[in-house]
Amino acid sequence: MEPRDGSPEARSSDSESASASSSGSERDAGPEPDKAPRRLNKRRFPGLRLFGHRKAITKSGLQHLAPPPPTPGAPCSESERQIRSTVDWSESATYGEHIWFETNVSGDFCYVGEQYCVARMLKSVSRRKCAACKIVVHTPCIEQLEKINFRCKPSFRESGSRNVREPTFVRHHWVHRRRQDGKCRHCGKGFQQKFTFHSKEIVAISCSWCKQAYHSKVSCFMLQQIEEPCSLGVHAAVVIPPTWILRARRPQNTLKASKKKKRASFKRKSSKKGPEEGRWRPFIIRPTPSPLMKPLLVFVNPKSGGNQGAKIIQSFLWYLNPRQVFDLSQGGPKEALEMYRKVHNLRILACGGDGTVGWILSTLDQLRLKPPPPVAILPLGTGNDLARTLNWGGGYTDEPVSKILSHVEEGNVVQLDRWDLHAEPNPEAGPEDRDEGATDRLPLDVFNNYFSLGFDAHVTLEFHESREANPEKFNSRFRNKMFYAGTAFSDFLMGSSKDLAKHIRVVCDGMDLTPKIQDLKPQCVVFLNIPRYCAGTMPWGHPGEHHDFEPQRHDDGYLEVIGFTMTSLAALQVGGHGERLTQCREVVLTTSKAIPVQVDGEPCKLAASRIRIALRNQATMVQKAKRRSAAPLHSDQQPVPEQLRIQVSRVSMHDYEALHYDKEQLKEASVPLGTVVVPGDSDLELCRAHIERLQQEPDGAGAKSPTCQKLSPKWCFLDATTASRFYRIDRAQEHLNYVTEIAQDEIYILDPELLGASARPDLPTPTSPLPTSPCSPTPRSLQGDAAPPQGEELIEAAKRNDFCKLQELHRAGGDLMHRDEQSRTLLHHAVSTGSKDVVRYLLDHAPPEILDAVEENGETCLHQAAALGQRTICHYIVEAGASLMKTDQQGDTPRQRAEKAQDTELAAYLENRQHYQMIQREDQETAV
């Protein structure tokens, strides 16, 4: 029987339950080999109450889950260990160790609970969040986790005295949550939370492995579930179970062992094993092969894409085993690939640029893995031509990591040609042709994308040299682009590559192309392996009408040789192509003087040389597949209709950033554009053409759109169905997605340049009474014959700080989103004059888009207020919901503008709120 609430047992449990959680997975990773697990006893799981509600599990009910045997040499308490932010691969690694990173989430209470929290009465105490199990604690409270017996999900098991091949399974890792998305797996109801950021109430119990969640009450969470095997969730096929990873015991150096070592030393000398294969490692991999599994190794380059890499690592640690996620800045991919080389059906995900992919492919070549694991790509940063070729897109936007893992699992395995480059000095070059700044060696001896020489390499080389000399001047993507443009223009005026044809000789498959090149007089010659080049352009084009050339492939063993004049280089950016020279299997290129060259984007000035290009091998890659091909049609599934009639609705960037985790609110904030009719099997590429024609039809549906603002060229589709939130679809991947997979009756698009009030379907009709309150501005379409106030009058009222006049104009139907010639809004002008009353009025009555509206130089009103040191106005704007992560044309955020104005207090405030915004979004993205 359960004790009553007044009993001593219940009271003692009550005091502990606020901080209690269970980790039922501890026992599968190394329990004491000679002790049988104790049977669950109801006396050890009393019915408990926490703030008036029954809780399902408590610390007191988990004492039967003994911790694993201590590791020799390992620290015995949390306080004696350092706070780790990376996975520990040493022999002293702690079982169930958390992976901490700093966080500013003020809404989450310390996980250890009030009884054990040592910092609850302190102010400004730093907090840490575990990337693998998502608990948040004060930094001083980390050592208290041992007192409540809470460890992170285990990432390995002890070998012990058992047979290492003995089959084992993973148990759930249960964690109490005060905030939880989704629905209870038992009752199907949502997790009701009235005050998300201030509630101490534990509402859910969820597993860090499979992400299943239950209400924290005995009617939903059954006690027997604590020891149930865990399925590892929807990504079980790619998750490497902790039961595969064993911590090995260091061999004992006994006298008998040393004699055996000496006796076998001669045999080891003649062994074919390399030094890496023979040395002892603290961890070994003992996989259990299964045809249904595709275990995944994730390699992340944190330097790629600004700060994207570091954030991506945290997301993968949550979805996967932390010991299958590797930071390439911590030593490269070789150790991990060597350790996992015997895992069957292994796949690799490279998170970074094309250079990161090349690094991993070269390492696979060195290790000679048979068969080589296929490599998928999560593109970070810009460029990413190889990722575009394999349908992974030109960069990472905000696609959920869960969807990325599904794409990697379902992707098609394809081949990629890789080419050897062998350069040697040209013996025929004279001393007058030598250049002191030139080198005899290429930056890379293998390329996957392209090898080029001439104009493009010269521009890239100047950029790299300038960045190495003055790195502080190249910390902005906008500045980098401006430098590229300026260098290209000056190089064009100087004509530094106009005589390229006079100094090179090209022989392809024994045929001399030099006369053809001299007639063409190109300023750039490219040897291309993949269709994409220079951030997505297609220089080979589609030679369907030319019988002399075949369409380009990345697995046919042929290179495409292309020449570029200045005219064809300019046409390349608008869909043109270069001058097709030939397709060949081998190239011999001879240069008679120092010429700039680049190998997959790595430039150098190469001295007069003789360069031979030949096929090296083929790498195995993962190509992102069309989604319908990965989902077979079920018998109860509805057939695709011949035609689809779909409502198109547009979403502004401000609404998307604020609401894309709340589908219903974002749908309400969308602006209807009209209706399109497309074939039932249309992909998004075809649908885009129909949508762009929508507003071009004067008498069509687009003319009746509630908004007259046309679509900007940068609009993209939003997936509203396949995830728990909206997310953007890269334009380069539109051909991979069907309309029926991202929309039902309505399709949503994101327009980053949409300004003005969001049109709603519930706008008042022309017969509705006109609003008289300043809180209800009159839409222009509802004013009949009365002419609306001129925008210039509104601007003047804001400039003169004339609050009454502005209010009067607004009541008369003035558009608070009016802009002047410099694209400055009324809020920009109000901030410039420092008028707090006008600022408050605009924030209360103008559409939310005004908060992040930018003027010509890319400044928002918050940038302006921060630069002027207007602390109160900054507070108003931030509290209204303005983005603190927007950058101006100089690449500065509002916080950086405050720092430049030497207002340290304002900068500290903005930094605090910026972190809060980032953590808020991250918490929502990783919520179960």
Swiss-Prot record:
One of its GO terms (cellular component) is glutamatergic synapse. GO terms for molecular function: alkylglycerol kinase activity; ATP binding; ATP-dependent diacylglycerol kinase activity; kinase activity; lipid kinase activity; zinc ion binding. Highest levels in brain, and substantial levels in skeletal muscle, heart, and pancreas. The keyword Cell membrane applies. Its EC number is 2.7.1.107, 2.7.1.93. It is an enzyme of class 2 (transferase). Residues 278-416 are annotated as: Mediates interaction with RASGRP1. The modification Phosphoserine is found at S705, S781. ANK repeats lie at residues 822-852, 857-886. It catalyses: a 1,2-diacyl-sn-glycerol + ATP = a 1,2-diacyl-sn-glycero-3-phosphate + ADP + H(+); a 1-O-alkyl-sn-glycerol + ATP = a 1-O-alkyl-sn-glycero-3-phosphate + ADP + H(+); 1-O-alkyl-2-acyl-sn-glycerol + ATP = 1-O-alkyl-2-acyl-sn-glycero-3-phosphate + ADP + H(+); 1,2-didecanoyl-sn-glycerol + ATP = 1,2-didecanoyl-sn-glycero-3-phosphate + ADP + H(+). GO terms for biological process: cell migration; diacylglycerol metabolic process; glycerolipid metabolic process; intracellular signal transduction; lipid phosphorylation; mitotic G1 DNA damage checkpoint signaling; negative regulation of T cell receptor signaling pathway; phosphatidic acid biosynthetic process. Residues 1-46, 59-82, 251-280, 759-788 are annotated as: Disordered. Residues 15-24 have a biased composition (Low complexity). A motif (Nuclear export signal) lies at residues 361-369. Belongs to the eukaryotic diacylglycerol kinase family. This is Diacylglycerol kinase zeta. It comes from Homo sapiens (Human). The lineage of its organism: Eukaryota, Metazoa, Chordata, Craniata, Vertebrata. The gene is DGKZ.
